[in-house]
């Protein structure tokens, strides 16, 4: 009943704001959480064009006043004045004015690039300049209001998180390892592979009293995997061929991306356990999801149509 009452209240609140002319500027996010635990009711965040993240945050916190001897309703918010000033200062720049009407998408170069471009083409976008093989890194797709930026996977997340790109296409492996503040909107279903734990045949990394040593390019993913098992783990970051580490007795096992498993078999390794599935995902900047809601929803709908073509 409390949930129904809360949603009914949100509905009435939205209707009141809509009647006041603010409906198209409001987005209700039932998944919004805050790092502070003193909020007792509705929470809100505010966004402004040109800022990559919220510039205002607050909410209702009745219980906080009671701690100071006043049992009464209360609410409040804080504003990041520096971010507001930076955003307003940039509004007059020509490139910023142009960006207001453009959805900029960061695409991952390399493994996902070919299939992402094929998806854009299937979605009806003119990608002839991208197909021409130039050394350019920023492309404007004709008659679409879409701009494409080509970058490394980890940089896709950086560009989207900081708001210089509105959307991004990146592998789930990068999302899991790097993390960040953004919306993960669509599983595109291509670039499929998996994270897996592998060892030399017969090696037991779960038994015994010794802390397992795992070599990997993905220490955050590895630690999270073993944490779920309530196990301590020592990770060694490897940039090259991770398969070498167990063969050289540097590590007890590896966590790496596996597609067919052929490389593992050829080096005398076997998959002990699958860690997580991986595929290409669409991510969206938190502020852009609000400020460019209609344009971004249009792009996502076109991409989803492209998947079905």
Model regions and ranges:
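Positively charged, Gly/Ser-enriched RNA/tRNA-binding surfaces
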Residues: 1-99
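Domain-level signature for soluble enzymes in the chorismate/prephenate branch of the shikimate pathway
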Residues: 98-309
